[in-house]
């Protein structure tokens, strides 16, 4: 995520052919990857060319990052040099996803109490993700394997992790009993992550605030630990002075964080454009990215409020995951647009799932909304996976590298 991104400095380019590394023992995996890929390469030659010119730029440090750097420096030394940076990233993401999915299994409506070990596993899983996410860039520099694929892969994993992290937090505090607050917290988290890359698309520089992702992750880890120790009674207790349930404390923090972060983001978006006449890095309108995340949030809100069967209230986790996958997809496309200095197009297959839900409601839900939600979830997940795999393979092939292995001889592309 963002504070850790300061520790990641990786860049590169791409090709449109399939990677040349499909020999034994990777043939099966490569064939499967080829099957998943989109029929047409997602990136044009012009985008690939501009990607080669991309240079990573960042500024600012969060409050706790300097304190964590010593641990991260020690940790990366423990990692064998043959392990690829992207492999470190994906392992951390999978740990984060698995621990959250277990929590979802026990708390599908975010109102149930899960076994103590599930909250502990989420806390440990998030800490492991944070740590691995922080050292993958260090491993890239250490192994002389920095490429543009690394930066894109890192941000892509972060976009998906954000969905599971915010959902896991809502489950931990049983926020499903307050569906409006749960809806706000989840989509506020996705929106803020999108805005972080939106302002980067405008200014060309990724900015870190004094309170950034490292601090938020540690706060969420504490929430999981409190859930394990205190159980449901903790969240039902009232906060002195404020006189609101303890479970709303993370929600109130989300409100404050959203106002603070968005104020800074939009200040950059409206005044920090580096393109012609204050436009984005691609020369497009600074407001154009709003159409994508705005469409996600508007559709999610309309479907939530118009459902005749209380679809979100009864199945909040499935609902958040469905729209979370769509949000992750459009965020990834925004990152690609920034790195390739290209325009974002509104038409996107990611919206097929939400469109099905919307149309089904428009025609008086002639198909069970719960069934359509599952269909939308599967379609959104498949669309995200196909796009991500296609982009990664196209870049890897163009660079003559492998996504999850370090070649003995490879060029290093410094972008910082």
From Swiss-Prot:
Record key words, sorted: Endoplasmic reticulum, Glycoprotein, Lipid biosynthesis, Lipid metabolism, Magnesium, Manganese, Membrane, Metal-binding, Nucleus, Phospholipid biosynthesis, Phospholipid metabolism, Transferase, Transmembrane, Transmembrane helix
EC number(s) recorded for this UniProt protein: 2.7.8.1, 2.7.8.2, 2.7.8.22
Any one of the GO BP annotations: phosphatidylethanolamine biosynthetic process
Main location: endoplasmic reticulum
Membrane-protein topology: Multi-pass membrane protein
Domain of life: Eukaryota
InterPro entries reported for this sequence: CDP-OH_P_trans (IPR000462), CDP-OH_PTrfase_TM_dom (IPR043130), CDP_ALCOHOL_P_TRANSF_CS (IPR048254), CHOPT (IPR014472)
Region (Disordered) residue spans: 1-22
Catalytic reaction list: CDP-ethanolamine + a 1,2-diacyl-sn-glycerol = a 1,2-diacyl-sn-glycero-3-phosphoethanolamine + CMP + H(+); CDP-choline + a 1,2-diacyl-sn-glycerol = a 1,2-diacyl-sn-glycero-3-phosphocholine + CMP + H(+); 1-O-alkyl-2-acyl-sn-glycerol + CDP-choline = a 1-O-alkyl-2-acyl-sn-glycero-3-phosphocholine + CMP + H(+); a 1-O-(1Z-alkenyl)-2-acyl-sn-glycerol + CDP-choline = a 1-O-(1Z-alkenyl)-2-acyl-sn-glycero-3-phosphocholine + CMP + H(+)
Pfam family membership, one: CDP-OH_P_transf
Residue sites binding Mg(2+) 1 per the record: 133, 154
Alphabetized GO MF terms: 1-alkenyl-2-acylglycerol choline phosphotransferase activity; diacylglycerol cholinephosphotransferase activity; ethanolaminephosphotransferase activity; metal ion binding
One GO location term (cellular component): Golgi apparatus
Pathway: Phospholipid metabolism; phosphatidylethanolamine biosynthesis; phosphatidylethanolamine from ethanolamine: step 3/3; Phospholipid metabolism; phosphatidylcholine biosynthesis; phosphatidylcholine from phosphocholine: step 2/2
Binding site for Mg(2+) 2: 133, 154, 158
Residue numbers marked as site, Increases basicity of active site His: 151
Entry annotation: catalytic residues: 155
Positions that bind CDP-choline: 86, 151
Annotated glycosylation sites: 144
UniProt-annotated location(s): Endoplasmic reticulum membrane; Nucleus membrane
TM spans (from-to): 89-108, 116-133, 156-176, 180-199, 210-230, 246-267, 286-306, 315-334, 349-363, 368-388
Cofactor(s) listed in the protein's UniProt record: Mg(2+); Mn(2+)
UniProt record similarity statement: Belongs to the CDP-alcohol phosphatidyltransferase class-I family.
Purpose: Catalyzes both phosphatidylcholine and phosphatidylethanolamine biosynthesis from CDP-choline and CDP-ethanolamine, respectively. Involved in protein-dependent process of phospholipid transport to distribute phosphatidyl choline to the lumenal surface. Has a higher cholinephosphotransferase activity than ethanolaminephosphotransferase activity.
Known partners and oligomeric status: Homodimer.
Protein name: Choline/ethanolaminephosphotransferase 1
Native organism: Xenopus laevis
Gene name for this UniProt entry: cept1
């Amino acid at each position: 995520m963002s504070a850790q991104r300061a520790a990641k400095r990786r860049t590169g380019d791409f090709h449109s052919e399939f990677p040349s590394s499909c020999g034994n023992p990777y043939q099966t995996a490569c064939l499967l990857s080829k099957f998943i890929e989109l029929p047409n390469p997602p990136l044009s030659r012009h985008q690939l060319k501009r990607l080669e010119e991309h240079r990573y730029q960042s500024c600012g440090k969060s409050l706790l990052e300097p304190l964590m750097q010593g641990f991260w420096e020690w940790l990366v030394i423990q990692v064998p040099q043959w392990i690829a940076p992207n492999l470190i990233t994906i392992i951390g993401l999978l740990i984060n996803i698995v621990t959250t999915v277990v929590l979802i299994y026990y708390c599908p409506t975010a109102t149930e109490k899960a076994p103590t070990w599930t909250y502990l596993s989420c806390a440990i899983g998030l800490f492991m993700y944070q740590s691995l996410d922080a050292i993958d860039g260090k491993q890239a520099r250490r192994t002389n394997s920095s490429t543009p694929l690394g930066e894109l892969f890192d941000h892509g994993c972060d976009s998906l992790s954000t969905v599971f992290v915010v959902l896991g937090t809502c489950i931990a505090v049983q926020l499903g009993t307050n569906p409006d607050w749960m809806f706000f917290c989840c989509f506020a988290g996705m929106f803020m992550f999108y805005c972080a890359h939106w302002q980067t698309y405008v200014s060309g520089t990724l900015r870190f605030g004094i309170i950034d992702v490292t601090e938020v992750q540690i706060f969420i880890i504490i929430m999981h630990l409190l859930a394990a120790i205190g159980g449901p009674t903790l969240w039902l207790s009232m906060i002195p002075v404020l006189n609101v349930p303890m479970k709303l404390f993370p929600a109130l923090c989300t409100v404050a964080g959203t106002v603070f972060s968005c104020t800074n983001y939009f200040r950059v978006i409206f005044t920090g454009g580096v393109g012609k006449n204050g436009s984005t890095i691609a020369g497009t309108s600074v407001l154009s990215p709003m159409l994508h995340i705005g469409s996600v949030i508007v559709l999610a809100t309309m479907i939530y409020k118009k459902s005749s069967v209380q679809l979100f209230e009864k199945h909040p986790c499935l609902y958040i995951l469905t729209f979370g996958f769509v949000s992750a997809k459009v965020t990834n496309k925004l990152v690609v647009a920034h790195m390739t200095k290209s325009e974002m197009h509104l038409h996107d297959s990611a919206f097929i799932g939400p469109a099905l839900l919307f149309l089904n409601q428009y025609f008086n839900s002639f198909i069970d909304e719960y069934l359509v939600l599952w269909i939308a979830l599967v379609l959104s997940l498949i669309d995200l996976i196909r796009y991500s795999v296609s982009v990664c393979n196209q870049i890897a092939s163009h660079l003559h590298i492998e996504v999850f292995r370090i070649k003995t001889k490879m060029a290093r592309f410094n972008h910082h």
